[in-house]
């Protein structure tokens, strides 16, 4: 029951991090300002002359206080040193944040809530540092860091709170009761220190239960789109640590603590309420205190400096003991930051058998491109625990290795994608001691029992046994990744299943699948995965657009495309750059339904301001970014087709606006109950199909881009003339496309550039059908009409920087090259609009270069040279009649 309450609390805190953090900070500020209204303005030494303010402090007290401070600093140093052994800098950062905020809360309580002076912190902070325990904070952080997604982060934080919360609560209660005994000693300094200790425990407990889990959840959520190759919380080697015994409370210890707590409660109750001193003694003591106060009355004085200068001077003036403490802290900090890195790395390398030389020495000569760590059997005698564990892991690999198909072990090139530590973390999960898997497949019943066992699972089954279960229909082939301990093993088994059904079993030999972060693919980008397709990525640029320079990534297998686009970018740059504007921004899915009461009546109602306002309110309520702009309707018999045009922020927007469309239809159904919805999409959008409606009305981002190329650049870079390019553009792009009955195809090869950028940047490649709509216009300009004016208008660029393939790390790298990765925080939607402008500008560069090649007669020659380099084409003549003068 108690664990369930803590679990609910942890889930709430992790699910609402902003609310909890803001509430905690607000409460802290309230405590800071509480005595501004209830307390007095007496500050000894500034506006009051207090006779008792300057007290003689015994040298023994100074020595004890200095030793206490040094011990506290050493204690914190060793705690952080232990955290570094885990090999994660994120735990260090989170633990440091926990320490800083706990100290801030505690200091606030001491200074303001109890109306204490800053001098009280000299005694308070050492005890706070001695009582803080980062092990619990790091344990909760490890729960969160073992997650693969944000939802799993919340669940793991809730699970960690359920496990650690009751234990931590009991520990805090026991510590407060034990330390609180000192407040009844009658020794004033001991009572003050014990009071500080109790407040330290309570402040730490408060932060651990509220601010810390919320902050962990928020930090990991903001770090989802990490630049380091994978999400920072994917530290899979923590998963096994979390299942260990250290997080499970010892029932014997818990009972002892409960009994101790009850005994201490009785002690406190007897001392504070039952054994109160007699009223006579209290009266006498009070009279003595009052007499003492009368003799030492504080006198108000005029401040000579401002309050902040007074506090600053007190903090700057340092005694010898403060110098000693600060020097020790600085020395340890320098040692920790600069001199322990190499030592820690060497220690971690010794603890990690995957990175040891014994592990990696075998495959060095086999294939330099293939990274497949294989453990080597060593017949020497070992005596350490680490080496014995390594031998057990080697035996396990030797048992599993013969089950791999022969084609998998053959030498072949394998591409490396993502962080190399991903393999290590995945292999760490599989390498557990004492896992013996027989070479012969076991019966299906036994395999099913092992698979359903929560403590064993698929890692205790061989690949042959998994294939046997799939063939027997016990495991669906599409669920292999979710049932295996690693996604990569699921992909490997599917490849083995598929290879047996192909005409050529070795067909998948050159399709790589290793070293890829499949956690970003599953449930988002692809199903039934058998590998990934490496495509060459070139760069064109710099593209000078709107006063900025962009290096444009292009993924293509067409020779000359990147080189041609790069030449166009150079010509635009020499001409002073290009300018672009967004003409419209919106996505337009469609719904289709038969006559609700009458199609014309519904159409007329939707065209009224009242009807549009009702639909817009329902539509806008489904998203922070989707905002309905207008409705466009068309009637065909009994059917009514509606185009919803809406802004979609930085996303491409189909899913976002489909959700808004469903909500709007539900609201429309309330006004017309007899309405019947046939399909959410009725092809009036139109999505991924050539259509005049997108060419005329626009879809996604509508962009126009223009540039002026000087005559000198046309002659020297493009190797042609303005007159020739204008004539070819009219006869090819305009007249030729019209003769072909083209819709939106009044360009030379816009689809080439659009598709190459889409593949490189994680866009939906099929969207190039509508996104490639473009009209290229050229005309002579300048004083002598020798300069070339070129413009490209693209009314339907469907593009986004969040969601879909943009979550994959290689595609994110290409988006980062352009500075548009993820959502724009300052102006939602700006990244997607900027990417659309870059696409249009790059298309214009490609159009410029290709039209120049056509005008100069270089197109066939360049393609034949680059794509068929063995053919001698020195005497090949151009094919165009118009050439450069």
From Swiss-Prot:
According to its record, how does it sit in the membrane? Multi-pass membrane protein
Motif (INSIG-binding motif) on chain: 75-78
Which residues are on the Cytoplasmic side of the membrane?
1-9, 79-89, 150-159, 221-248, 340-885
Membrane-spanning segments: 10-39, 57-78, 90-114, 124-149, 160-187, 192-220, 249-275, 315-339
Q: Which InterPro entries does the record associate with it?
A: HMG_CoA_Rdtase (IPR002202), HMG_CoA_Rdtase_cat_sf (IPR023074), HMG_CoA_Rdtase_CS (IPR023076), HMG_CoA_Rdtase_eu_arc (IPR004554), HMG_CoA_Rdtase_metazoan (IPR004816), HMG_CoA_Rdtase_N (IPR023282), HMG_CoA_Rdtase_NAD(P)-bd_sf (IPR009023), HMG_CoA_Rdtase_sub-bd_dom_sf (IPR009029)
According to UniProt, the tissues expressing it are described as: High expression found in liver, heart, kidney, bladder and subcutaneous fat. Lower levels in lung, uterus and large intestine. Lowest levels in cerebrum, spleen, spinal cord, stomach, ovary, longissimus muscle, and small intestine.
From the UniProt record, give one GO term of the biological process aspect.
cholesterol biosynthetic process
Q: Which GO terms describe its cellular component?
A: endoplasmic reticulum; endoplasmic reticulum membrane; peroxisomal membrane
Q: Which keywords belong to this entry?
A: Cholesterol biosynthesis, Cholesterol metabolism, Endoplasmic reticulum, Glycoprotein, Isopeptide bond, Lipid biosynthesis, Lipid metabolism, Membrane, NADP, Oxidoreductase, Peroxisome, Phosphoprotein, Steroid biosynthesis, Steroid metabolism, Sterol biosynthesis, Sterol metabolism, Transmembrane, Transmembrane helix, Ubl conjugation
Instruction: Indicate whether Lipoprotein appears among the record's keywords.
Output: no
Q: Where is this cross-link: Glycyl lysine isopeptide (Lys-Gly) (interchain with G-Cter in ubiquitin)?
A: 89, 248
What top-tier enzyme class does this entry carry? oxidoreductase
| Subcellular location field | Endoplasmic reticulum membrane; Peroxisome membrane
What reaction does this enzyme carry out catalytically? (R)-mevalonate + 2 NADP(+) + CoA = (3S)-3-hydroxy-3-methylglutaryl-CoA + 2 NADPH + 2 H(+)
Glycosylated residues: list them: 281, 296
* Source domain of life: Eukaryota
- The modified positions for Phosphoserine read 869
Q: Which residues form the SSD domain?
A: 61-218
**What pathway annotation does it carry?**
Metabolic intermediate biosynthesis; (R)-mevalonate biosynthesis; (R)-mevalonate from acetyl-CoA: step 3/3
Q: How is it modified after translation?
A: Undergoes sterol-mediated ubiquitination and ER-associated degradation (ERAD). Accumulation of sterols in the endoplasmic reticulum (ER) membrane, triggers binding of the reductase to the ER membrane protein INSIG1 or INSIG2. The INSIG1 binding leads to the recruitment of the ubiquitin ligase, AMFR/gp78, RNF139 or RNF145, initiating ubiquitination of the reductase. The ubiquitinated reductase is then extracted from the ER membrane and delivered to cytosolic 26S proteosomes by a mechanism probably mediated by the ATPase Valosin-containing protein VCP/p97.
Family statement: Belongs to the HMG-CoA reductase family.
Can you name this protein? 3-hydroxy-3-methylglutaryl-coenzyme A reductase
Q: Which organism is it from?
A: Sus scrofa (Pig)
Native organism taxonomy: Eukaryota, Metazoa, Chordata, Craniata, Vertebrata
Give the gene name: HMGCR
